[in-house]
Amino acid sequence: FSSSYWTPIVAEELKGTDILVGAAIGFPFGQQTSAVKAFETEEAVRMGATVLDNCMNVGALKDKRYDEIKQEFKEYVEAAQGVMTKMIIEVCYLTDDEIKAACELCIEAGIDWVKSSTGQYAGPTLEQVILMADCCKGTNTRVKVSGVKDPRPQNAYVFLRAGADLIGTRQAPQIIDSFDTMRKIGICLLYTSP
């Protein structure tokens, strides 16, 4: 992921690979207008982004302006033109009811992923990840957890067991290297192919 400024350069460097080109929309607090976010989304796609992270307007959610948020989310999906969409809801600032409402709005708008955090603030609790996973179960919206705090390997694997589909982290080698230990203590199950 990069800021949109770097998207064309990253897209050019990654041309011919299967690595996704990520661009950030509405960072860090999602307080831009819907029109600005839609334009930013269209620009990122035009410049070569293949996956987008958008920040939800937490203030609007806390004000219960659900129709406005849902409309903004739909405009984001439309502006993405089929590119993978994620919505960061920043769970550290939300109540359980607000987390549920945010997930439901993402599902209704057709957003591909609901993401717990930017990773810049407090990460999610286990209970928050379970709540997100329960809300999204049986839908086309998947759960990504970012902002995994220490102990990262244990927390990352527990979040996956709790229903997260993806972990966003800068500590992937540390987490992967701990797989055998996590399996040994029962956090990770042995993988068997279907």
Which residues are covered by each model-predicted region?
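Conserved, mostly hydrophobic/aromatic
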Residues: 10, 44, 87, 114, ...
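Active-site-adjacent beta->alpha loops and helix N-cap segments on the catalytic face
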Residues: 4-18, 32-34, 59-76, 94-99, ...
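Catalytic cores of alpha/beta
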Residues: 34-40, 98-103, 150-163
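Active-site mouth loops of central-metabolism enzymes
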Residues: 22-36, 88-98, 146-151
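Glycine-rich phosphate-binding active-site loops on the catalytic face of alpha/beta enzymes
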Residues: 50-60, 113-121, 160-181
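Conserved small/polar residues in nucleotide/adenosyl-binding loops
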Residues: 191-194
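Glycine/small-residue-rich loop that forms an oxyanion/phosphate-binding "nest" at active or ligand-binding sites
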Residues: 30-42, 50-62
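Hydrophobic faces of well-ordered beta-strands that scaffold small-molecule active sites
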Residues: 2, 21-25, 52-54, 85-89, ...
